Amino acid sequence: AAGFVKRHPVGCLLALACVLVIALLQSCSSSLVSIGNAGAGALGATTYPSEDEAILGAEAAYAGLEAELQTYLDTYESTHDYDEYHFDLDEIEHDPYVLISLLSALHEGEWTLSQVEGSLQMLFDRQYILTERVEVETRYDSDDEPYSWYICYVTLENKNLSHLPVSLLSEEQMSRYSIYMSTLGNRPDLFPDSPYVDKYITNPPEGYEDPGEY
């Protein structure tokens, strides 16, 4: 072998160089695959796991619960029989990205509408607190005869869906929720009218870094 190397030094050097180049290319290819897998994993971790049908269906179902509540309040006086009414009502509203991020944090992995129906009702009941209270006063007519006067007080408190995660989610779930909210699940096209699209996507605050870019 030593004699062969002495007789063909240039050829041996070329062969050695080829081996080194092949090894280098294999190493680079392996590194690129690892980087690609890591990038795909990071993107997947920040993207809503469910199909559009489930996401849009969940939003529509929640909006339906809100519509029922609004109708109940709008027709309250015509469907009740009290003498006097006092209303103190917060606005009925929610942000769809907050809702979907909450559902995706509560249900790890892909979920369907039927799987989150219970969570939708739970979130709705926590967000909206409706209180109805009736007081009865004794009044007197022109003949000084007593009669009962019924006064109904209706209060609706909107706890704000975005305030629920702190008391509702575990530490791990809170981490997922925060990531989904910061990226909007990588789906700013789903609910373009949401103010969060402008806040995080269109005009992100100075110094803000998208977790999906890590």
What are these regions (language model features)?
Residues 1-214:
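Membrane-proximal envelope biogenesis segments
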